Each structure stands twice: as structure tokens, then as C-alpha cells.
Regions:
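Transmembrane helix-loop junctions in multi-pass membrane proteins
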Residues: 2-5, 35-40, 83-88, 166-176, ...
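Membrane-interface loop-to-helix entry segments
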Residues: 24-31, 35-48, 173-180, 198-259, ...
Length: 465
């Protein structure tokens, strides 16, 4: 029975996360780019000025439940995760350095996709019985497409609830305990027998912290993420830039391997990778799965933003993809390629390759700081996905009374994830994660005209000033 479930899940997973899904996501991103006049390029300076330039200004009086900065930090908390460290390493190992170039290309379209998701989420959001602003794909399907498309909103919420326990929590906690275990063993191998107990303790502590943050409501979530995300991002950026500076002599070759290797991977992988298609596939998939453009999840956080201007908040969607993929993922690639650490091209790789890059540059002590970065990334992801799951549960059951019990259960999963091998459950959750994109992409396709109209009205009026 278990084998049958695993086989069926693998078949569905391969399709959902395979080439058809990537083609659909890229196609929708291209359509949205055309209908908005490639807004992400034309208005990129405006997007940066509107986001980074105003992040720390005093917020305008409004009726939201998060500041725009807190909203983007919450979305980034869920988006910038362990995949930025492990996923990029895997893309380079299988697709060669050229995969990074194709990752950049996918991010370019992803910027417009996420911009559209955020804009629609703010435009079609509503208030729940507690007076909180709620939105996301299920709400712009419900309020933007009408009753006959309601089943898509229900499906999105169902897939979201089924996803968060594995993708958003258990796998992340497992990454935390693995990072801590590795750091401990690097200094004292005699404590190996104590690790199961240590993992349980870590799981309990994480569960308590998650419960404290999530049960505190939307304002506490925003307060935590606006402090944690800038810290962890800056911390990782400083470490990664340090690797580039200390290995600056390799930078010209690395850039050549990325750009030229995108079209001739064989020349830069010792002949191990000869397929340009494989380089494209791995780079594009890494870009899509890293920034979550097309899944619609980030828009759930942005819908809580303290703003009356959907398009202006949408600019944070452009910034989010830029920060996640163009900055964080690129820096991970630079750590691996600039450090000169051996890459077994053609063989699967993960976080260990990135850690090896840091260790080759800074020495063994850097394993502690890498573990700290992994823990911060994973914990922030748990917080962000907790919000997503609670919003999906609230929509699915049509009452906010399920939120409290849901978050308690969600927090408890941290203990399970820290102490058990959940291989099949993780794979099933990953499949449901991919299934979330189907109703969202359909909605984006049908509402692309609304996005184009909102953009035109915004920049033609006073809103852009």
C-alpha cells in the first residue's frame, strides 16, 4: 500500500514539478509581462525607490494590519529558505554554472508574476470577523472571478493546508537539527549518542517559539519578521561577499562560466554536462521554486499590508524576487564557484556543497556560522508558512475559529519534524505544494486584464507620485 502511494505520488510530483509546470509558469509570466508593458524592466528603478527607499519611513495612516515593510519581510521569511542554500548547489551540480544564467532569466519573468499576485491580493482582499485584512489567491479567485470559479479557491486552500505541515514546517525543522548536529559533531564526535535527545530538545524549543510568534497574531508575526529577515539576509550577504572578495582573482572566470556555460555547459564541466537543455531546466526550475512566483503564497502576506494602493504594494513583489533570486541565490552560486571547491558535475548535491565553499575560504569555524544562517532561514520559513496555512484554513472552513487549533497543531509538528524520518510525507507535501500553482495560474491568466488595467490607472493618475 505504502509503495503504491509512493509510486503514484512520484508520478504526480514529476508532472507537477516537471517541464509542463515550468512552461505554464513561464508562459503566464510572459503574458503578464506583455500586458503590463514589461513593467518589471520599465519601472524597476521606481520599484526599488518605492520599496527600499521607503522601507524605514514612518508609515502613512491607514487601516491595514501590517506595514508594507513587515508584509514583504513576512513573505521573504517564507520564500528565503534552505532552498536558497541547498537548491542552488543542486542546480549547479546537475546543470553546470550556466544554470545560474537561466535562473536569472526566470527571475526576470517571475518579478512580473509576483507583482501581479501581490497587486491582485491587495485589490481583492477583505476583512475577516476580527477586522484583519485577509487576501491571497483564494480571495482574488473568489472576488475577482465570481461564484462559478469558487472551486478553484477551495482547491487552492485545501492544497495549502495540506502543504504547510511538510514543506513549511517539518522539512525546515529537520534542516535546523541537521545543521546543529553537524556543527556539534565538527567539534566533538563523542556526543553522537546524545544527538537524538538534542534533536528532541531543539524540536520542543522551536515548537514553543513558533507558537509564541504565530499565536500572537498578525502584528507579532510582522514585528518578528521585520527584525529577523533583514538580520539573516545581511548576515548571509556579508559572509558570501567575503568569499568573493577573498577569491576575487577567480571572479572573471566564474562570470565567464556562468554566461558562456549557459550555451556551452560541456566546456566548463569537464564534459560531464553536455546538454544545454539540462542547464536551462535546472536554472529555470531553481529560479521558479526559490522565489515561489506562480504559487501565489507570498501574496497572502502582502494582502495584510497597511496600504490603499495595490500597484504600489505590488512593487514589493518585484523587489522580493530580486532579493531572493538575483541577490541571495546568486551569492550562493558565487560562494560555490569562487571558492574553487570541487563540484561533482552530474551528481546530486545540496547544502553540503555550499558549506564546503564557506569552509574552503574561512576554515572549519565557518560551519558554526553556516549552521546559524541555516537555522535562521529555516525558522523564518516556518513562521511565514504558518501564516499562509492559517489563512488557507480560515478560508476553507469559513471561520476564524479554526486558526487557533490549526496553529497549535502546526507548532506541534515541529517536534515531529525534529525527531522522525518523514520521507514519504515530505514528498506528498511537496506534491501538494506544486498543485497550489494550478488554480493560481488559471486565476492569473483570467485576471491578467485586471492587472493591466490597475497598472495603467495607477501610473496615469496620482498613485505613482
Amino acid at each position: 500500500m505504502i509503495e503504491t502511494i509512493a509510486a503514484v505520488n512520484q508520478a504526480v510530483n514529476s508532472f507537477i514539478w516537471g517541464i509542463p509546470a515550468m512552461v505554464c509558469i513561464i508562459g503566464v509570466g510572459l503574458l503578464l509581462s506583455v500586458r503590463t508593458g514589461f513593467l518589471q524592466i520599465r519601472k524597476f528603478p521606481y520599484a526599488i525607490r518605492t520599496t527600499i527607499g521607503r522601507m524605514f519611513r514612518k508609515k502613512d495612516a491607514s487601516d491595514g494590519t501590517m506595514t508594507p515593510f513587515q508584509a514583504v519581510c513576512t513573505a521573504l521569511a517564507a520564500t528565503v529558505g534552505t532552498g536558497n542554500i541547498a537548491g542552488v548547489a543542486g542546480a549547479i551540480a546537475i546543470g553546470g554554472p550556466g544554470a545560474v544564467f537561466w535562473m536569472w532569466c526566470s527571475a526576470l519573468l517571475g518579478m512580473c508574476t509576483k507583482f501581479s499576485e501581490v497587486t491582485l491580493a491587495v485589490h481583492f482582499r477583505e476583512r475577516n470577523k476580527n477586522g484583519e485584512l485577509v487576501g491571497g489567491p483564494m480571495y482574488y479567485i473568489k472576488n475577482g472571478l465570481g461564484q462559478r470559479w469558487q472551486f478553484l479557491a477551495v482547491l487552492y486552500s485545501l492544497f495549502g493546508v495540506l502543504t504547510v505541515f511538510g514543506t513549511g514546517n517539518a522539512t525546515q525543522v529537520n534542516t535546523i537539527v541537521t545543521a546543529i548536529d553537524s556543527a556539534v559533531l565538527a567539534y566533538n564526535t563523542s556526543v553522537k549518542s546524545f544527538l537524538p535527545t538534542l534533536n528532541l530538545i531543539v524540536g520542543v524549543v522551536v515548537a514553543m517559539l513558533v507558537a509564541m510568534v504565530l499565536l500572537g497574531g498578525i502584528k507579532r508575526i510582522g514585528s518578528v519578521t521585520e527584525k529577523l529577515v533583514p538580520f539573516m539576509a545581511l548576515f548571509y550577504v556579508v559572509l558570501a561577499v567575503g568569499v568573493m572578495v577573498l577569491n576575487v582573482q577567480r571572479l572573471p572566470y566564474v562570470l565567464e562560466s556562468i554566461i558562456a556555460g549557459a550555451f556551452n555547459p560541456r566546456a566548463f564541466t569537464g564534459g560531464a554536462i553536455g546538454s544545454v537543455f539540462l542547464s536551462v531546466q535546472k536554472g529555470v526550475s531553481r529560479g521558479i521554486f526559490s522565489n515561489e512566483a506562480g504559487l501565489g503564497t507570498g501574496s497572502i502576506a502582502h494582502a495584510c499590508a497597511d496600504t490603499r494602493k495595490p500597484v504600489k504594494q505590488g512593487m514589493f513583489g518585484i523587489f522580493e524576487v530580486f532579493a531572493d533570486t538575483i541577490v541571495i541565490c546568486t551569492l550562493t552560486a558565487m560562494v560555490i564557484l569562487c571558492s574553487g571547491v570541487p563540484v561533482g558535475y552530474g551528481a546530486a548535491a545540496g547544502a553540503e556543497l555550499t558549506i564546503a565553499g564557506f569552509t574552503a575560504t574561512y576554515g572549519g569555524w565557518s560551519s558554526i556560522f553556516t549552521a546559524m544562517a541555516l537555522c535562521c532561514f529555516a525558522f523564518s520559513t516556518i513562521i511565514g508558512w504558518g501564516l499562509y496555512g492559517s489563512r488557507c484554513a480560515e478560508f476553507l472552513f469559513r471561520t476564524d475559529k479554526v486558526v487557533g487549533p490549526f496553529l497549535v497543531l502546526y507548532s506541534f509538528v515541529s517536534i515531529v519534524g525534529a525527531t522522525m524520518d518523514l520521507g514519504l510525507l515530505w514528498n506528498i507535501a511537496d506534491t501538494f505544494n506544486g498543485l497550489m500553482s494550478i488554480p493560481n495560474l488559471i486565476a492569473l491568466l483570467l485576471l491578467s486584464g485586471t492587472v493591466a488595467k490597475l497598472v495603467k490607472e495607477f501610473f496615469a493618475g496620482e498613485g505613482a507620485r
